[in-house]
């Protein structure tokens, strides 16, 4: 099972001007660090002007249904370095490969501004994708509840465990 830890640091202070961010979420890559278990921890920062990042556990109907494209709102698309070129590798659950997709929980902004600025920390399990190529990275994208899609960030390259 994949574990997702969301820590949100809201910079909403009464003495400071309220932050103004676009309503479309924006990501900034922070880290892609190895863990003792052989996996990696992905850390990205995000901003969102209208404060609608994250899904409630009950968000499983309509566009968030389990078989719908937006059931997972954080997607980490797997790539391998092959012959000097980054190559997207489709991970199909029907063949036993599990995509690196996550449901970021909702964090309701506090204060008078709906704007959000926070950090997402994702514990990614060790991956055992067979093949002759040993270097990987992920393309990371976030969707908010309004289905606005963030910019895409790339993790640092890493050697397979």
Describe the function of each predicted region.
Residues 11-14:
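C-terminal motif of bacterial Sec signal peptides marking the signal peptidase cleavage site
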């Amino acid at each position: 099972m994949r574990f997702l830890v969301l820590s949100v640091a809201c910079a909403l202070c009464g003495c400071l001007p309220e932050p103004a961010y676009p309503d479309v979420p924006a990501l900034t890559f922070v880290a892609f660090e190895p863990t003792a278990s052989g996996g990696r921890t992905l850390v990205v920062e995000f901003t969102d002007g209208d404060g609608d990042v994250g899904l409630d556990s009950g968000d499983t109907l309509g566009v968030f249904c389990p078989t719908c494209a937006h059931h997972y709102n954080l997607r980490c698309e797997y790539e391998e370095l092959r012959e000097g070129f980054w190559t997207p590798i489709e991970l199909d659950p029907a063949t036993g490969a599990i995509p690196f997709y996550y449901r970021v929980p909702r964090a309701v902004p506090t204060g008078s501004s709906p704007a959000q600025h926070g950090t997402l920390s994702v514990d990614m399990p060790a991956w055992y994708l067979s093949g002759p190529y040993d270097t990987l990275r992920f393309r990371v994208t976030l969707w908010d509840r309004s289905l606005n899609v963030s910019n895409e960030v790339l993790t640092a390259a890493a050697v397979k465990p």
